[in-house]
Amino acid sequence: MKTIILNASPRKNWNTAQLLKEAQKGAESVGSEVEYIDLYDLNYTGCRSCLACKRKGAEPCKCYWKDDLSPLIDKILRANAVIIGSPIYFGEPTAQFRALYERLIFCIMSYDSHANNFNGKVNVGLIYTMNAPKNYFEAAMHPTYNTTESLMGFLGGKVMTYASCDTVQVADYSKYDMSAFSEEAKKAHHDAQFPLDLQAAFNMGADLSK
């Protein structure tokens, strides 16, 4: 088994990364080989609409744009599982997440039938972190991500989503202009909830990598 874990956060050691590293431990606990990648270290953009993947005679399920993302897409399509983590900014995952998502899905989608050219099976895990409370995420935000989850199903495996909500943004709020947030309340919630989030990420890594 091969599991690829992708950090779509610019922060390499904060909430999203911590959850992904627990997912890595979960994958490793069931014997999967894991490759962990920080997407912000790579040089790539979103889809350039070159349409090379749609040309007659083109190899199916291949992104032809020459940058750091195309070989990663090849790796994902050869893996057994991919777990992607992203913070939510203004209600959406990061630009790095979006660029990966649109290029990955577009290169496997048929423009003859809008069907799926990919015949493999890659399980997908999506981990989101955000300042919003859980009830707001479930009522107002999660429904907007249904398209993402549905299209990730083109990879042929199961798709799991987990949201870590009302997260702590910084270690010391006194150093920042963030008076809209209660540091005491944030940290109390973090101390109670984040260990559960870490366990959920571990379980996701194990479940998707079996």
Label every model-predicted segment:
Residues 1-113, 178-210:
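N-terminal beta1-alpha1-beta2 submodule of the flavodoxin-like/Rossmannoid cofactor-binding fold
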Residues 8, 39, 127-129, 164:
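Cofactor-binding loop segments of dinucleotide-utilizing enzymes, especially the Rossmann-like FAD-
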Residues 47-49, 138-139, 171-176:
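Short aromatic-enriched loop/helix-cap "lid" or pocket-rim segments at secondary-structure transitions
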Residues 70-74, 122, 171-175:
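Membrane-targeting and insertion segments and their boundary/processing signals
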Residues 89-91, 132-133, 168:
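Short, catalytically relevant binding-site loops at active-site mouths
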Residues 95-96, 108-162:
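Short, glycine-/small-residue-rich phosphate/pyrophosphate-handling segment
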Residues 160-171:
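Beta-strand-loop-alpha "switch" segments that mediate conformational coupling across diverse proteins
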